[in-house]
Amino acid sequence: MKVLWAALLVTFLAGCQAKVEQAVETEPEPELHQQAEWQSGQRWELALGRFWDYLRWVQTLSEQVQEELLSSQVTQELTALMDETMKELKAYKSELEEQLTPVAEETRARLSKELQAAQARLGADMEDVRGRLAQYRGEVQAMLGQSTEELRARLASHLRKLRKRLLRDADDLQKRLAVYQAGAREGAERGVSAIRERLGPLVEQGRVRAATVGSLAGQPLQERAQAWGERLRARMEEMGSRTRDRLDEVKEQVAEVRAKLEEQAQQIRLQAEAFQARLKSWFEPLVEDMQRQWAGLVEKVQAAMGTSAAPVPSDNH
């Protein structure tokens, strides 16, 4: 009887443990606080949103996902999305560093160090996701047609853990970027603690976004792409307007230069005409006097020649 009760107790405890594990497996995952920003934020956030959407699709482990996992297509897609995210993040960080020039050197160095650490953690999380999927591919290929149900369950568990860590580190990176951006906007020499005190509204805004992320998570990718296209179109129109304004300024400058050159040319012509008139007034009397002297000399020569040409009277008549 004791043995029977012990067996029943073990069976009951095993059933409870299985229910607990099933509840843990089916527990919904928290969404990223700043996912709303991925839909309407910076370019690196949009790239991270695409990585997030693709990872969520992989996590479904549908038949199509399992087929593509056996090839290198999934890891190639993740690699491209990772590279795009880190590239856009690096460009955004460089842009903020240029704006942070007026801030004290010590503050800027501390902010940059914290931001680099958060950026490295996010990159490591994405690299772990890719590495785990590559490991799963190798394990499945090594099974040689055997059941891979246990491998899929283990992969799903790892992906949930990695996804939660990715959420946490991406949220931390966004907060640190907000600190960095606030320092660039502030442009004053103050410590990191003083800047963080001014970020209370941003933290509260993140909580509000976390409360509304459930409704935003279901927004179709097409709508987000259209919104991104509209922002890009608006930016292109703004750049075109600036270019036209710059061309108008250049045209005005060219017109001013042409007017100045024409004015200077007119002044040079007037000066040349005045100088020519002055020379004429100087030399004209001399020329007239030389002409009179020459005419008188010619008359004298002609008179002298006429006298010498007259006939001499003869003595024989």
UniProtKB/Swiss-Prot annotation:
Signal peptide: 1-18
Region (8 X 22 AA approximate tandem repeats): 80-255
Predominant place of localization: secreted
An example molecular function term from Gene Ontology annotations: amyloid-beta binding
Subcellular location: Secreted; Secreted, Extracellular space; Secreted, Extracellular space, Extracellular matrix; Extracellular vesicle
SUPFAM superfamilies per record: Apolipoprotein A-I (SSF58113)
Pfam families (UniProt xref): Apolipoprotein
Residues covered by region (Specificity for association with VLDL): 278-290
Region ranges (LDL and other lipoprotein receptors binding): 158-168
Keyword NAD set for record: no
Protein purpose: APOE is an apolipoprotein, a protein associating with lipid particles, that mainly functions in lipoprotein-mediated lipid transport between organs via the plasma and interstitial fluids. APOE is a core component of plasma lipoproteins and is involved in their production, conversion and clearance. Apolipoproteins are amphipathic molecules that interact both with lipids of the lipoprotein particle core and the aqueous environment of the plasma.
Family, similarity comment: Belongs to the apolipoprotein A1/A4/E family.
Protein name according to UniProt: Apolipoprotein E
Gene for this chain: APOE
